[in-house]
Amino acid sequence: MTKLEVCCYSVDCAQIAEKAGADRVELCCGQSEGGVTPSVGALMQARETVTIPVHPIVRPRGGDFCYSSNDFTIMKNDIARIRDLGFAGVVVGVLDTDGHIDMPRMREIMSVSGSLVVTFHRAFDMCQNPMIALKQLAELNVARILTSGQQQNAELGLALLKDLVAATKDQGPIIMAGAGVRLTNMQKFIDAGIRELHSSAGRTVPSTMRYRKAGVTMCADSDVDEFSHYCVDGEVVEAMKSLLVMGSPLAKHT
């Protein structure tokens, strides 16, 4: 059966995702930056309160995936902490200046990761040649690749996603479709033979604050609403999971 990974920007969201039936959580913070490394406090709380597999992202900043020596050292330290805390896996990716997989650095990451299951994240979508990148990640024994098919969303990238699935039919990383995967279009990915889906399955929820200071924001973008935040929608996760269960071979023959 196709698995559902839910992208969660807080431990609260991870708990909602688990209760709603998600198979796995990608734990991040910094939604506006596309997901960066969660804090040590968030990691510890997730380990204590979430029982399904949690794969934290290790991304020290937003922007590109070519990192300074300090950034890279921080990443290795974070991976070691995640490993020592007993997480199931980690989500990471490093490119070189020419848009290729940074093989020397990724080898170091794989070594530091130890028994962690490694997902190469959407840095893959910024690679110059996706099929070469796929071969390199297979050589590294990366477990899965999170990708939109090198498009702004995975629905637009379906053609490449199908090619990647075909190329890994017998061996290689699991191809996990992500970016714009939602209840209304997920059947397209199921029909394409994609084994894992990644979705934020979320909505914007209002702040619980009654007093709301006007004219001041904590962000450089003055249009940001300080009194709302993004959160996983448990009902959406339940509906997505139900569709996956109904589409499984077992369900079709019962």
Swiss-Prot record:
Transmembrane segments: none annotated. Keywords: Cytoplasm. It comes from the Bacteria. SUPFAM superfamilies: CutC-like. It is found in: Cytoplasm. One of its GO terms (molecular function) is copper ion binding. Coiled coil: none annotated. One of its GO terms (cellular component) is cytoplasm. Pfam families: CutC (PF03932). Belongs to the CutC family. NCBIfam families: PRK11572.1. HAMAP family: CutC (MF_00795). This is PF03932 family protein CutC. It comes from Yersinia pestis bv. Antiqua (strain Angola).
